[in-house]
Amino acid sequence: WVSCKSKEGLPEDISFSVNYLGANITQVGLNFSRPAAQILGQYYQFIRLGFQGYKEVQYNSLTIAKYIHDEIAKMEPFVNYSEEVVNPLFIWYMKPEYAKNAKWTLYDLQDKLSQHGWMVPAYTLPSKLDDYVVMRVVVRQGFSRDMADMLLGDIKNAITELEKLDYPTPTRMAQEKNLPVEAKVFNHGCKAHKAAK
């Protein structure tokens, strides 16, 4: 183990920062060995399910991801970043013409969804694409069609609620002024970090 009393003792080139769930999170990872529990768990699952079982699990996840992707595309404010879904995950962003008149941002939608227990992150893309604020859905094993319908219903309800706003949200005003957006995330007792744009 290596412990540093302050950030000054830690070289910047071994830290990794990512804008995730509305906050800049910095991690430092030096791993020279890994526990074997995950490998043993995967080995057990492979023996239990076999190739066909894994194929069915992945196919189910991909089918549900495509369903959510298609339903998001039907919603007026959004456009999917990619036309196709080749993995059980995808991102979308707000249509530029819609965003011009909207009183809310995807950060506000993230906040509304988190109030219903959904962890759907809104974040900026890496440099040269950092004008895009996107949201991401990852469909994991066990995420059912019923859960997908619940998520889509909560997204629609949140949009309806956000559309009723009389005034722009703080994140919308900050975005218009090109100011950093104050994060609204719970991060286990640490102070909230500021998110880019």
Regions found by a protein language model. Name each.
Residues 67, 71-75, 108-118, 154-165:
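Generic non-transmembrane alpha-helical segments
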Residues 129-197:
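PLP-dependent enzyme catalytic core of the Aspartate aminotransferase-like
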